[in-house]
Amino acid sequence: MNSEEFRKRGKEMVDYIANYLDTIENRRVTPDIEPGYLKHMVPLEAPQHPEDWDNIMQDVEDKIMPGVTHWQHPRFHAYFPSGNSYPSILGDMLSDGIGCIGFSWAASPACTELETIVLDWLGKMVGLPEDFLSYSENSKGGGVIQGSASECVLVSLLAARAHTIRQLKKQHPFVEEGVLLSKMMAYCSKEAHSCVEKAAMMAFVKLRILEPDENQCLRGSTLQQVMEEDRAMGLIPFYVETTLGTTSCCSFDNIAEIGPVCEEYGVWLHVDGAYGGNSFICPELRGPMKGVQYASSFNFNPNKFMLTNFDCSLMWVKDRFRLTQALVVDPLYLQHSYSEKSIDYRHWGIPLSRRFRALKLWFVIRSFGVQGLQNYIREHCRLAKRFESHVRKEPKFEVASPVHLGLVCFRLRGSNQLNQKLLSSINASGKLHMVPASLNDKYVIRFCVCRQTATDEDIDHAWNVITQFATNIQDIMAAELVERNEMEDTVENKEKAEKEAEENTEDVFRMLDEKNKKSLRYKRSFFVRMVSDPKIYNPKIVRSLPGAGTTRRHTTSDSSDECNLPVNSPTIDQDTLTQLLQQTNLKEVFSDIETKYKFITKTTSDLSGRLQACENLLNTKESERLK
C-alpha cells in the first residue's frame, strides 16, 4: 500500500468507523456465536501472496463483526464505560503514524515532555496536592501514563516493597532480604480489584484481605486493628491499597481514616481511582478524595470515564525516586547525555517500549475542555439517578447499594437464583448486556451508564426490557415452584407408602383375624412367631390346653410383645402333644396359614406396583424440569 492508496483507504476507514458508531444500535449488542467460531471462517495458514484490500474489509464485516461485543452500543450496560471519542481516535491515529518509541527523553523528547505536561494538567484538574506534580516548586513527585490500573497497582507495590526492604536492611544489615520479605504484609479490602491479589502474587508478598463495612467501605479502625495484631506476631505492614469507586458497586474506601493509620505505621498508601477518580474533575464530587494527602501514589483511568480510548491509565507518585529506584535498569545502549536534566519514563514502569499516548489525551482535553468533560460526567450521574428512580418505584425490585456516579446495583426481591436467571435470560436475548456482582452474599445486577451519548430514552428502554423479563422469569419460577412442590409431595407420598407397607406387613394378621385381636397381639413377623411359639397362632390349640380358662400376662424381653397365655401351663410330654394334635384339625390350621401367606404376597405385590408408579412419575417430572 503506497501513500496514494493509503489516502484513499484512510478516508474509507474513517467513513467505516463513523458509520459503525452512527448505526451501532442496529447490531446485536453481544455476539451470538460459540467459542471457536472464527477458525471455521478464517484460514489457519497465513496467505503467501498479497490480498485485495476490499476483500480484507469484507471479511471484517462478514467474519469479525459477528464476534464483536459492541461496548459503544446504547444497550451495553456492563462493567464500566470504555472511553471513546473522535478526538481520541484521531490522536491514536497520529501516534501510530508517528510511530515513535518514547522510552527516554532522547528517544523522543516531545513524547516525554507532552506526557509530563498533560499529567500535570490532569493532576490539577482532579485536585491532587502539588506534591504529586512534576513542575510544582520543591516537588519530588510526578505523573506517568501506564497501560492499565493493574500496572499502576503492581508498580506501586514493587516500589513499596523495595523501599521497605532498603529501610529494614539499614536496621538489620545481616538479615537476608528473603527473610525480611517473608514477614512483610500488604492489605486491601475484599472489594478491591482482583489485580491487587495478582500483584501480590507476582511480587511474592503476603496480602491480607480485610472486610469492609455494610456499605462496602474499608474503614481506618479495621485496618489499625489488623495491623496491630500483625505487628504483635512479628509481621511488618508495608503497603495498603484503597479504592475510590470499587468494581462491584462503586463504593469508596475511607482514606481520611486510613491515611493517618498508614502515616503512623510508615506504610505506603496507594489509592486506586480507576473509575471514580475521573469524577474528581467535578469539584462537587471530590468528597471521597478527603485524605488523599496521605497517599504515596494515586491512579485513575481516563480510558474509563474521560472519553479517551484504551490504553491510558494515569499514575502519580509523591516521591518519584522511590519509584525509579525499584525499577531502574540502565544498560549502556539506553544511556544519554541529558539523563540528569530530563525524565526517562522507562524507569517508571514495567515495559521499556512506550507509545505516544499523551497525544490522544491532549487531543481530548483540548477538544472538549474541562467544562465539556465535567458535563459528560454529570450527565452520566443524572442518568444513573433516573434509572435508580425506576427501580425504587417498582416494589418487586430493590436498590442493593448506595448509587454513586454512573453505576446502579439492583435486584429482584427474592432468591439469588431468581436474579441469576433474570440476568442470564436478558443477556441471552441480546437486548441488553449487564454483569453481576456479589454484595453481602446477595446476587445483584450492575447497571452502568456506558455510552458517551446515552439519553433518557436509552435508560427507559433498558428498564422496560428488564421489567418485561422480570415478569416472565417470575412466572416461570412460580411454575417451577409448583412443580417442585408436586415432586416433593410425590417423594413424601412415596416415603409414606413405604412406611405404610412396612406397617401393613407387620399388622397383617391383626386385620385378618379381628375376632382374635383382643386375645392375641401380633407385633412381630408371622413366620418368626410361628417358629418360636406355634401354638399361640391357633386359638384351638390354645383353648385345648389345660388351664386355658385362667390366663396370666406373658412376659418377654420386649414389654410391647404381650399375649394372653394359660396360667400354670403344665409341661406337655410327647403323648399329650400327640393327643392334642389328633384333636386339632390340622388341615384347617394350614389352610389358615396359606390364606395369610397369599394375602402377604398380594399386599407386597400391590405395594411394589405403587412404588414403581411413584418412581416413574418422579422420573417424568425430572425430565420435564430439565427440558
Task: Locate predicted features.
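Conserved small-domain helix->loop->beta segment predominantly found in fold-type I
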Residues: 31-35, 340-379, 388-416, 431-441, ...
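Conserved PLP-enzyme active-site core in the AAT-like
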Residues: 139, 151-322
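Short, glycine-/Ser/Thr-/acidic-enriched flexible segments
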Residues: 191-193, 214-215, 245-247, 276, ...
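C-terminal, well-structured subdomains that either form a transmembrane helix-short loop-helix hairpin
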Residues: 242-254, 260, 294-299, 369, ...
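PLP-dependent enzyme catalytic core of the Aspartate aminotransferase-like
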Residues: 439-627
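Glycine- and acidic
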Residues: 3, 98-106, 132-144, 180-183, ...
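N-terminal entrance/gating region of PLP-dependent enzymes' catalytic architecture
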Residues: 1-140, 345, 424-434, 442-443, ...
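Active-site C-terminal subdomain of aminotransferase-like
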Residues: 265, 288-394, 402, 563
